């Protein structure tokens, strides 16, 4: 009897519960007597504390987080479900077949081994998921799981970041974390989110420094395979940082103080390092001072006439070892023309320089533009998108230089420049553009120079949501 009274004393009557007032648990309670209410205890007592989450609710939460936009990144998910192995493996194969030659990290065999043996290791899983996201984003494609669920690069990026936030803050400087940041940077650059992309790049560069990979002596105790991977990653980040320096006007921190990766004897042409090593040469011939001068919009004291001559002479041609009109060749070709035109612009600021790359030599932009057009004639259009915003941005840089100088030509040279500019613009506007502001600035510059753009329809950007400073190497 005593137990029954204690149990009743802990339960509020129906009226007090609805009115949200204190109940003494008596039958009838004093509150009901005072207000002439019929005191009953018909509703069952509810368990105190937070309610348990039903499976249906968990599934719905996961669906919403997968479908949401970039804002989802800042919120940790309620549940954690790994991307299926088979789906990741499909992405790894796509990476090997299309992208390794452009940004080489690990071969398919090495990646597949990691997937099979260390799938449950969080750091390895995050890297493989980020690599899959970057692959789908670079190729602008999507992939379906066995359950017919479609995944895009954006969705995989969000899943990867959500998982990282749930289990770790990514402060660890192990090689997988650095590669995860690099791959996420590529994915977000492709979906036109330059600020997030640049922040992720900075995180990777910071971890490179924390791990001591900017010092050659750090590599001495590593195996050849470990050295190769870290050297490749170091130079991928160095090139990325130098690209951002120009368009986000930020100083660089990495320098070519580390030996590049060595050539490897391979039978699979997709694993050739030739084009990557040539790309490293293209980005390191100018030197750190060149990019810092462009970032500051001023001439650096260490950026001399001799260094600009070196850029012009050494980047005039590309290595004969590179297969023409391949993915690797396209990356090298446009980067080479782009850096040469930037060197010419820097010389333009250094008026009075008396050497072959003289600012008064108006033929130089025409020559660079012609070289670029030759490289475009036999290149399939679908190969440009693999490189993201890099190709259209570099093309617009060359076109802008022509617009800047066309008014200074005599009649004959002006006619020649206009014809070349017409062809360059026609090619530039055939590409998918990610940088809204740069495209508008170029169009305005042409209008101010009374130049009619050779396009038959209004300017349109591709289908992605735009960030005003969307760029990518």
Swiss-Prot record:
Xref: SUPFAM superfamilies: Zn2/Cys6 DNA-binding domain (SSF57701)
Give the motif span (Nuclear localization signal). 46-54
Question: Example GO molecular function term?
Answer: zinc ion binding
- Mind listing the UniProt keywords for this protein, alphabetically? Activator, DNA-binding, Maltose metabolism, Metal-binding, Nucleus, Transcription, Transcription regulation, Zinc
Supply the InterPro entries for this chain. Answer: Carb_Metab_Trans_Reg, Maltose_ferment_reg_DNA-bd, Transcription_factor_dom_fun, Zn2-C6_fun-type_DNA-bd_sf, Zn2Cys6_DnaBD
Q: Which residues bind DNA?
A: 13-39
* Family membership noted in the UniProt record: Belongs to the MAL13 family.
Q: Which PANTHER family match?
A: GLUCOSE TRANSPORT TRANSCRIPTION REGULATOR RGT1-RELATED-RELATED, MALTOSE FERMENTATION REGULATORY PROTEIN MAL13-RELATED
What is this protein identified as?
Maltose fermentation regulatory protein MAL13
Gene that produces this protein: MAL13
